[in-house]
Amino acid sequence: MSRTEGPMTAAVNLAHVNGVDIEYVEQGEGLPLVFVHGYISDHRVWDDQIRLFSRHHKVIAPSQRYFGTRQWRDRGERFSPSTHVDDLAALIRKLGVAPAHIVGWSYGAALALALAVRHPDCVGSLFAYEPGVTTFVEDPEEVRIVTEDRHDMVGAALALKSRGDSAGAVGAVFDHANGSTGLFEALSDTARSIFLDNARTVPLMFGAAEPLSINRADLAHIKVPVVMARGGLTRPLYRIATDVAHGCIPASRLAVIPDAMHASPVLTPTRFNQALLDHLSALAVA
């Protein structure tokens, strides 16, 4: 493991896992808390959470393969949920922090669920905020709603991507995931730059990678304490995904964050952080 320079007081480290260098931030001491980011972002999206939770925990926040600003070793051929889940498990084991408390948001929440299914030794508890996976949704009416909502959510971004406007697609992904236009432009320059730095991943996220598949039986086998969390203002897709996953996991608690959208960790971090603190307090590890 080696270090590079980063914008935070925490060191930005490199860990060699599965043949690649994974960048991650590590800060604080105590029980390990691993933050898993979603699409078009990297470990910097968790800066607010890192500052708060590193007071009492060893906080680890990786940038998944192909995300962040590091040069790629290939053209993105291995971009897939399976790659990211396996990288995450390998990193947790290499750092010697298993089982860790896992916090995932959006695509990262889907990866966190898959991690608990495929690598249960790595997970001590799970806080999953609005996972983007819906393969466990079976009710025909809910499937219809999810399908229509997904098309509505990604349509503008796909149109911009097809014109080669990856930067424009980033803003569209952010706004439509939150169901409100203008939010991306209202972000601080620092926050907006994190997402724009990951514009090169837009073709990959809409590419031919095998989608993540988690079924109800998979979720039923998760035995660790879980909080499935969503915002009170979230889109139908994320509401249904969160609620159905909650109903499938035996040791799950549902947390609804008032007046929060999909990007609550960035837009309303105080509310998001309180929900996570409540989870950790219930585990007596806050």
What is each of the regions a protein language model found here?
Residues 28, 95-98, 283:
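Glycine-rich phosphate-binding loop signature in dinucleotide/nucleotide-binding domains
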Residues 188, 193-247, 256:
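Conserved serine/cysteine hydrolase catalytic core
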